[in-house]
Amino acid sequence: MTKDILDADFIKEMAKTTSNLYRLGWDERNGGNITYLLDEKEVVEYLDVKQIIRTIPMDFDGEKLAGKYFLVTGSGKYFKNVEEAPAVNLGVIQVSEDGKAVHLLWGYTDGGLPTSELPAHFMSHIARLSVDPENRVVMHCHATHLLAMTFTHELTERAFTRTLWQMCTECLVVFPEGVGIIPWLVPGTNDIGKATSEKMKENRLIVWPHHGIYGAGQSMDETFGLIETAEKAAEVYTIVMSQGGIKQAITDEQLKALGERFGVEAKAGYLNN
């Protein structure tokens, strides 16, 4: 007999994280989406993986993820409702062997579907797994101050990254590779998925100008914390600019010393000699 899936740590983690994202104002209405790569051994504790509820076609070649299991937020679902009704707002899916569909094993009990950003998520998982086999989570949200910065700050990766590094001491330690930035693209398309996944090969944080941010990591906590750290730096930047602008900041020499102390190396060319 399988255990009750509502007791699974991965369901509890997802519910807690979506609630926090909503509480912080980063996922208004049905904004935002999360995909969580699960190990088969943890899935079979709670589900009979041979019992397919329905098969959902994909307009994307997911063959590189064939057979893999994911916990995915639903399309059009509100993060604020996940804790109270996880079976309606979440789904456990398995990618079909040919990569052209996903099998629903649990959830979406009202007939719902996985997030419309599923292609972008799957492309990002493929990209991250190619450089980090332990990557498990891809998270998209509308972090307020990072979003605002895309209207007022130079949109080059080096300049954007340097500003974030200079706002909070921990930023260089948390994302020494910097942030990636793609052009504005229509969401829910393969084009935005391809652009994001290309950046994901070198970055775990990808800014979608005038829209939001994508983050990736080995756990829910790591991914949430990555976005949270960058957003805090963007908030500090916003406050600093409203107080009259930067008078002094962390210097490049100090950033180098910080990297040496914590065993990280700033992305090549991002610090001045």
UniProtKB/Swiss-Prot annotation:
Its main location: cytoplasm. Its EC number is 4.1.2.19. One of its GO terms (biological process) is rhamnose catabolic process. Its cofactor is Zn(2+). The active site is at 117. It catalyses: L-rhamnulose 1-phosphate = (S)-lactaldehyde + dihydroxyacetone phosphate. InterPro entries: Aldolase_class_II_sugar_metab, Aldolase_II/adducin_N, Aldolase_II/adducin_N_sf, Rhamnulose-1-P_Aldolase. Keywords: Cytoplasm, Lyase, Metal-binding, Rhamnose metabolism, Zinc. Pathway: Carbohydrate degradation; L-rhamnose degradation; glycerone phosphate from L-rhamnose: step 3/3. Binds 1 zinc ion per subunit. GO terms for molecular function: metal ion binding; rhamnulose-1-phosphate aldolase activity. Zn(2+) binds at residues 140, 142, 211. It is found in: Cytoplasm. GO terms for cellular component: cytosol. SUPFAM superfamilies: AraD/HMP-PK domain-like. Pfam families: Aldolase_II. NCBIfam families: PRK03634.1, rhamnu_1P_ald. Belongs to the aldolase class II family. RhaD subfamily. Catalyzes the reversible cleavage of L-rhamnulose-1-phosphate to dihydroxyacetone phosphate (DHAP) and L-lactaldehyde. This is Rhamnulose-1-phosphate aldolase. The lineage of its organism: Bacteria, Bacillati, Bacillota, Bacilli, Bacillales.
